[in-house]
């Protein structure tokens, strides 16, 4: 049985690496669901249906945030990079360059 989230044989991966891969896929799925709700909300004309979709989309935002936080806690290099870019002001590309340097100094870690 094949799984799209793996690029190596799953049986050769540690349990931590498999969990990490599952969480990355979960994050992707949540982002996709958020986009689908955006599209549905954009074209929905019934106010009550639209409100329900907006409420459901909020759940997807929560799930996305939880998945991302899990991955960041397990991957210090990601967290170091993102802390320099997310929720900041300034040129995003310049911040990204600074984030790359910060990530290089962070400890290793991932699934």
Regions found by a protein language model. Give the residues of each.
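Iron-associated oxidoreductase/ferritin-like identity signal
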Residues: 1-111
């Amino acid at each position: 049985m094949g799984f799209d989230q793996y690029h190596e044989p799953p049986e050769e991966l540690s349990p931590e690496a498999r969990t990490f891969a599952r969480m990355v896929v979960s994050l992707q799925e949540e982002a996709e669901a958020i986009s689908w709700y955006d599209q549905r909300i954009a074209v929905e004309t019934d106010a009550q249906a639209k409100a329900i979709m907006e409420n459901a989309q909020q759940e997807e935002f929560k799930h996305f945030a939880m998945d991302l936080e899990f991955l960041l806690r397990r991957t210090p290099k990601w967290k170091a990079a993102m802390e320099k870019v997310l929720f900041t002001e300034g040129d995003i590309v310049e911040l990204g360059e600074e984030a790359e340097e910060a990530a290089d100094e962070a400890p290793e870690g991932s699934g």
